Amino acid sequence: MKTLKLSACVIAIFAAMNANAVELNGKNLTQQDAWAIAEGAPVSIAPEAMNRVQKSYDLVLDAAKNGREIYGLTVGVGLNKDHKVLSANGELSDEVKAASRRFNYSTLRSHSVAAGPILDPKLVRLAMAIRLNTLLNGGSGVQPRVAELYAEFLNKGVTPVIPTKGSLGDADITLASHVGSAMIGEWKVLVDGKEVPAAEALKAKNIKPLIPEGKDALGILSNSSVAMALTMDAAKAMGQILKVSPIVYGISLEGLNGNVAPFLSQTTAFHPFPGLQEKAKELREVLAGSYLWKKDPSRRLQDPLSFRTTVYTLSEAQNALNDLNKVIDVQINSSDDNPGVMVNADKADTQYDQVAQYFIKTPKAEGAIIPTANFEVLPVALRSE
């Protein structure tokens, strides 16, 4: 309860300081708002979202206290998933907490191994905004301080240095770990465009370093927020290309003295693929007033294929981008955590022991901690291609 009151206080301070801040609640972050944060807009955290984070954290602690096997908390990660690293025996003693912290520090340090050129700071901010929002969904089980730190870093202009090369299994593990390393006062960050030691920046900005415990390390490193930032950047560029492409095509068609027949309303209605008629209408509007609408005896009956089929090319490119944006919106507003921490989880199929074992109920918390494959970004990856 003390932690929750402190979190609420921090949120209130942020809200007062940032009247025009983008409020995050884990549910409805738009790509437009995410880009605003990337460009420097401050953030605030909705109180109900931080309440979800607190309840999720309480559920994880109670589960650990009751001897449940929890990936990344009471057992290791990766190849060490069957190796017990924490045994609470019904009590979260100082010794148990110390062991948890050692494991978290070790996990962040051992995975901060990316290399190569550093990621554009705007994309780092975008990735952090995405991860903060997905944390606020309540599925990670991290302590509220982790969410607060994401907000503090964004609001105080502290941007972790993230090298762009390196991969380990699924998700952005070796890249995102550098965010956690900066939060614990290690590694490097950018402040006002200058690279400085994280410890120095945290002290100068009056940011208290994270003391990671429980599922904190896993929650910070095991997600796909960096990949989503890169995907959103590509989608944004594609959107800009598609915005000007009809104009470029119209100018080119005029230069060719081309034929408007392939994108007439009669033509596309005759073969009505999704989006085709809308794109054809856009091309006709671009060419409104053009000399191409006047009959010309020298004009070809049919243009070269590259011109004749452009309406299909642009239509399908637009459909692909629309589909990609839909799954991006799902990805940045839901939990990709493994395991997923679900407060007041749906009890479907709990008549089976295999399912019932994931559920926990204590005087303080009720829900489930379930192994997931939600780190899989195949829906986004396929549409990105």
Predicted regions located by residue number:
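Gram-negative bacterial Sec-dependent N-terminal signal peptides
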Residues: 1-20
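N- or domain-start disorder-to-order transition segments that initiate the globular core
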Residues: 21-67
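Acidic, low-complexity proline/glycine-rich segments
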Residues: 22-31, 199-222, 282, 286-297, ...
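Short, hydrophobic/aliphatic alpha-helical segments
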Residues: 49-69, 149-164, 205-210, 364-372
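Glycine-rich loop at the start of a catalytic domain that most often binds anionic cofactors/ligands
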Residues: 79-101
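Active-site cavity-forming subdomains of large catalytic enzyme subunits
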Residues: 109-273
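Accessory "access/gating" subregions that flank catalytic or transport cores
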Residues: 253-385
